[in-house]
Amino acid sequence: MGGLDKVPVKGIAAVVGAVLLLILAFTTPFSSASDTQAATEEPEVTQVGDGAAIPTARTAVTTPPAEHPAVSIPAPAAGAKPTQTVVISVDGGCETDKGTIRSFLDVGKQVQGRFTFFMSGLCLLPDAQRMQYRPPGHLPGQSDIGFATAELVDARVRVFADMWNEGHEVGTHFLGHFCGSGGVAGWSTQEWRDEITQARQFLDNWAANNPQVTDQSLTLPFDSSVIKGDRTPCLEGDRPAMWAAFAAEGFRYEASDPGVLQWPRKVAQNKLWQFPLPALKLSGTNLWVLSMDYNLLVNQTNGETDVAPGECARVEQQTYQTYMDALEGVYNGNRAPLFLGSHLNSWVCDSYIKALQRFIVDAKTKYPDIMFVSNNDLADWLDGMDPATLKGLQQLPEQKY
C-alpha cells in the first residue's frame, strides 16, 4: 500500500475523538510545460533539508494551468426549482496501488460528473525527503500520516493529470494531518499560511523531489494556483484564524464545518463560501450523522475497520440507502446542494467506496437532471446567480425528511 492510502491507527484515534464531539451536536435533525533539459544532459544537483542530493527541478507543472473543461449549471428559472447539485469531495485524493482513484474517476465519467479532491500534499513528497517538511508546532519531518512511497509517485502524478483534464477540482487537505492536542486546532493564521505555502511548494516542485521518476515528459497540467478551497484535518481549526489565512491565500470556499441540508452562505467578514458536511439520517435509525465516511464508520461499527463479511454487506447497503434517502429529501424539497465526503478508504471491505459508487450511478439513473459538480463549480454557480434569487433560496428552511 502507498503511504497515504490508509489512515494510521493514531489518525483514526484522533478522528474518532473529533467525530464523537461532532456526533453529540447531531442527535436531532437539523499550455503544457515543455522539457527544457535534453535527456543526455546531466541535471544540476542541489542539497535539500536532510542533505540528500536531488536534481534541480525541470519544469514539471503547467503555469498558468492548462485550460480546465467548463461546466454550465442552469440558472434557476422563475417559478421553477433550481438544478439539484450533488457535491462529492475526497479527503486525501492520492492514488493507491489498488488504483482506487482511477476507478472513481471512471465512475465520474459514467455520469459526466466532476468531483473535488482535497489533496494531501505529502503524497508527492517521498519519505527520503521528509525533512523538507517543517510542520507548525512540530519537529521537521514529523507527520501523523505517511509520506509518499517513491514507487507510487509516477502513478499519482498521472492520475492527478487525468483528474484535471477530466474537469475535476484539486483542493487541499494540507500536509501533516495533526488532530487533537497539539494539532491544527491551535494554529494561528500565520501557521496556517506556513502550512499552505509548503503544500504549494511540494506540489509545484514534485519533480525535483522525485528523481526516481525518469519519464521526462511527465508533467502536471496545473500548478498550485488552482487550489481555491480546503478541508481541514478532522474538521478542526480555530475558525477566525484559519478563515483569515484562507482568504489571504486566495481561497473562495471552506468545507470543514458541520451543517444541515440548507443553501450555503458566505462568512460575512471574509466572503468565503461555507460548504458544510450536512447531517444525514442514518438509514433504519433515528441517528443524524455527518455525511463523511468516518462518521458513518463510528456509528455503524464503533470505529472498527475490519469486520465479518456479513457486516460488510450491511454497512454498504445502509450507507448507500442513507445517501439515496438524503438525495430524495432535498430533490423533492428545498433543492439544497447535497455535500458528501469520502476518503475512498478500504475500511469495512471497501463498503464505503462501493456504496458511494453505487449511489452515484443509481442517483443519476433515478434523477437524470441532477448534476455532480465540484465545490469550485458550485461557487461559480452561486456567485453568478441573481442575488435576489440566491437570497430567497438561502432563506428556505433546512430540509428534513
Q: For the regions a protein language model found, what residue spans apply to each?
A:
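Conserved, mostly hydrophobic/aromatic
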Residues: G108, H173, A199, F246, ...
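Active-site cleft segment of glycoside hydrolase catalytic domains centered on the general acid/base Glu
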Residues: F178-A199, L203
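Short, well-ordered amphipathic alpha-helices
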Residues: I196-T214, I360
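N-terminal pre-catalytic segment of deacetylase/amide-hydrolase enzymes
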Residues: G2-I88, T96-S103, V373-N376
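Active-site beta->alpha N-cap acidic-glycine motif
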Residues: R58-E169, G176-G180, F202, P211-G237, ...
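C-terminal domain-boundary segment and adjacent tail
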Residues: V71-I73, Y253-R265, M324-Y401
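Active-site-adjacent pocket scaffolds in enzyme catalytic domains
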Residues: R134-G137, G146-A150, Q216-Y331, D386, ...
